[in-house]
């Protein structure tokens, strides 16, 4: 029986079918109705007798970016109605005191307070549901003070709202993010409610379309790097905000392990941005929070670091005349000047073409216009453009490696996406990396990651007690720990001597440990994991090529720089520094 993975991107929808060691791929244009693109891609890949169907989508991300979610109300403890608007008083850019904040997902006129208060020792003020006003909304987020510790009041408010508004998507904070830090919990709950009707409608339409096409119900990739049922994804859609990129990291980790590299750095360079993620012992590094479209999301996610540099990034000069690349992008339409679709602004792709790093015709029959690229880059050195964009990506790669205490030379670089293999060798040279792995399916690796993804269900429990008083903990998972009086935590795998593990982690991160100081257990994170299919890729007779050379891949081109040798076996290109 076959296994199908379909990943929807902004421009293309990719499909991979794995059937008894035979791999079939397809790439179709993404339409406004994503479910139509999914079925079209599955058919193009020849999906038949499919036993398992996994899916990555941008529906939730697009709705949040474009602010096209449901009409949402916010209910909190009386006196805290401004919580989503006050935010944290930190600034993303320290020297921009007047920088504008994104608008909250819920306007102040739809933010309501209800009387009742939970304190450290229990109930301080009884809940008064009569103070809950009449609400007219498609979705409601409920976040009462200290509900992560005692959800009695919050549960009662949510039940009352579900009775009053039977067709609304009602989310309570203890159901989605039962952790302390009021603003992040409220922000996550608001996003979960805001996205609910949009994602639920899409997944219902996709499930119906899949059934009509003879496909099983789709499993949906979550930001955590595992798939869940459509019902689970629709219930808490904030969990699928990094769906596609997470699938790419899963694919990179599995492919690196197949090549014998348990430690790797995933490097996904697309048209508008680049995502990087550290993989240690064949597992992607994880984070418990991520900001998306200006909204903090306190949910498990693969620890991606993103920069606005991609193949379609526009080249420009700042007020001082310095060359800059991105974050603006030419997109797919009109695209880079060399696409011949009316684009006139210079891009990274135009520079790569003029440097001889791209063929005259791309996959899909797109003929590149060298003269148009020369006109767009008039007066600009193409090599300087590549140097600038490489510098942007090097910073991202160092963030996930050097800045976290890892020597990148001890890792392989897994390069994928449409533009990743073009820049991989030069980036590896700068970081001292001697092995680069380029998937044969570099342009559709996220879809391949979906094919082999695990089913994963994450849970978190807040403690906020001295570690010595925590009692028995689960045998497996992670613990958020800190010294008493600290504001932030370190996450350490659960083990017998958890205190000693935390001291070591603190010393590695900050250069010192205070073994006489009391340790506080903040939260414990666990995951229920059901392993996905094995990655069984067909091999061909190995061929070897030395750089400089261009190697064509489905949906991508690999630039083999001087001093590098590539071995190709039908599954991947393994590039080695000589």
Residue ranges and their predicted role:
Residues 1-73, 125-141, 154-173, 197-204, ...:
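N-terminal glycine/serine-rich phosphate-binding loop of ATP-dependent small-molecule kinases
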Residues 4-6, 51-56, 74-76, 169-174, ...:
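General beta-strand structural signal in soluble alpha/beta enzymes
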Residues 6-36, 104-121, 367-368, 454-464:
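Short glycine-rich, Thr/Ser-proximal phosphate-binding strand/loop in the N-terminal lobe
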Residues 8, 134-138, 205, 261, ...:
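C-terminal, non-catalytic interaction/recognition modules in large multi-subunit enzymes and RNPs
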Residues 17-18, 65-70, 76, 83-90, ...:
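Short acidic, glycine/serine/threonine-rich loops at helix termini
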Residues 35, 45, 173-181, 185-188, ...:
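ATP-dependent carbohydrate kinase catalytic cores
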Residues 70-118, 173-177, 449:
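Active-site phosphate-binding/coordination module
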Residues 143-189, 193, 521-536, 569, ...:
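Terminal amphipathic helices with adjacent charged low-complexity linkers/tails
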């Amino acid at each position: 029986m076959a296994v199908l993975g379909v990943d929807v991107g902004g421009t293309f929808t990719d499909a991979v079918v794995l059937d008894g060691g035979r791999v079939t791929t397809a790439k179709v244009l993404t339409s406004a109705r994503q479910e139509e693109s999914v079925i079209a891609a599955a058919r193009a890949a020849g999906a038949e007798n499919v036993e398992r169907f996994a899916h990555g989508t941008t529906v939730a991300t697009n709705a949040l970016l474009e602010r096209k979610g449901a009409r949402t109300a916010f209910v909190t403890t009386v006196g805290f109605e401004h919580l989503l608007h006050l935010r944290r008083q930190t600034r993303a850019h320290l020297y921009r005191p007047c920088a504008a904040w994104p608008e909250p997902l819920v306007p102040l006129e739809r933010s309501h307070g209800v009387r009742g208060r939970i304190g450290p020792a229990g109930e301080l003020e009884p809940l008064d549901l009569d103070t809950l006003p009449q609400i007219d909304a498609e979705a409601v987020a409920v976040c009462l003070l200290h509900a992560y510790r005692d959800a009695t009041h919050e549960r009662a408010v949510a039940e009352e709202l579900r009775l009053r508004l039977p067709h609304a998507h009602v989310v309570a904070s203890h159901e989605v993010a039962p952790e302390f830090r009021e603003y992040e919990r409220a922000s996550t709950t608001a996003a979960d409610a805001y996205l609910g009707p949009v994602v639920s409608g899409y997944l219902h339409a996709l499930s119906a379309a899949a059934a009509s096409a003879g496909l099983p119900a789709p499993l949906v990739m979550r930001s955590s790097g595992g798939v869940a049922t459509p019902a689970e994804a629709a219930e808490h859609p904030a969990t699928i905000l990094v769906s596609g990129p997470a699938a790419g990291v899963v694919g990179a980790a599995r492919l690196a392990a197949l090549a014998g590299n348990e430690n790797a750095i995933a490097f996904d360079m697309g048209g508008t941005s680049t995502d990087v993620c550290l993989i240690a012992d064949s597992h992607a590094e994880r984070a418990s929070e991520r900001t998306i479209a200006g909204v903090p999301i306190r949910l498990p996610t693969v620890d991606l670091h993103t920069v606005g540099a991609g193949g379609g990034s526009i080249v420009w000069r700042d007020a001082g005349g310095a060359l800059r690349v991105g974050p603006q992008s030419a997109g797919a339409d009109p695209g880079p000047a060399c696409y011949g679709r009316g684009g006139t602004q210079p891009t990274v792709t135009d520079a790569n073409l003029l440097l001889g790093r791209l063929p005259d015709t791309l996959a899909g029959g797109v003929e590149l216009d060298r003269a148009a690229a020369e006109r767009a880059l008039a007066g600009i050195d193409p090599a300087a453009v590549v140097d600038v964009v490489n510098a942007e990506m090097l910073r991202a790669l160092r963030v996930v490696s050097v800045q976290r205490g890892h020597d990148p030379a001890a890792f392989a670089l897994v390069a994928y996406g449409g533009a990743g293999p073009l820049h991989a060798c030069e980036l590896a040279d700068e970081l001292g990396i001697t092995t680069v792995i380029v998937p044969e399916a570099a342009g559709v690796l996220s879809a391949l990651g979906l094919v082999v993804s695990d089913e994963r269900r994450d849970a978190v429990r807040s403690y906020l007690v001295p570690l010595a008083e925590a009692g028995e903990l689960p045998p497996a998972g992670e613990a958020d720990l800190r010294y008493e009086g600290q504001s932030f935590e370190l996450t350490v795998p659960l083990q017998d001597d958890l205190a000693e593990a935390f001291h070591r982690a603190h010393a590695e991160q900050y250069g010192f440990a205070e073994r006489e100081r009391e340790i506080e257990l903040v939260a414990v994170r666990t995951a229920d994991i059901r392993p996905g299919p094995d990655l069984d890729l067909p091999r061909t007779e190995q061929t070897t090529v030395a750089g400089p050379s261009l190697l064509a891949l489905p949906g991508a081109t690999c630039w083999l720089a001087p001093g590098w040798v590539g071995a190709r076996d039908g599954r991947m290109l393994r590039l080695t520094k000589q």
